Amino acid sequence: MKILIAISSKKYSSQTLEVGMRVAKAFNAKPTIVDVGDKINQFSLKEVGVAQERMESWDLDRPGVEVLEWAFDFLSENKFIEKKEIESGFPKNTLIETGGRRSEVYLKGTVCDDVSLILRNGEIIEELISEVQKEHYDVTIIGKSQSSKKDYELSQYIDSSIFIVNNYQLDRNYKILLAIHESHF
């Protein structure tokens, strides 16, 4: 089973990441954590490439990397990745471009074989739908949108089961009703 966990920041996504990793552990699933950053204008792609090269030489991070670094720290603190990965620190220099708007870093997990951290740029709904279609995730875990209906919109168009985290409290026990169809679960 493959699970996509969509995050946006420490402030708004800590509950989503916590629940997502607990679900991945419970189902022995392969978790992928994704952050969707702002869309890069097509006219400025060349300038962005030059800026990224300069940022690397100046040891500055590209936008969105700090969210992935926070997710790495969370995975480290909760021992979801191997000790060797933790000791090496966040591998921002091994962020691999896997498409025009998609970069990925692979980590060796303790819950399952691999944990992936992905940074995408663009409109959040479009990018998450594209990610699910391309990688064939079984479940997408997102946080409840506070100010918009993006969670509702995503639930209408995404081609996977969806789990929306809303006001999760660590000290409570929850029951989850899993509605399934005739898929390979």
Annotated model-derived regions:
Residues 61-68, 99-100:
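Well-ordered, non-membrane alpha-helical segments in soluble/globular domains
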Residues 1-61, 76, 83, 157, ...:
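Small/aliphatic-rich secondary-structure junction motif
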Residues 40-41, 91-92, 148:
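Short secondary-structure capping/turn micro-motifs that flank functional sites
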Residues 11, 17-19, 117-175:
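Gly/Ser-rich helix-loop-strand patches that form or flank binding pockets
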Residues 73-140:
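Structural beta-alpha unit
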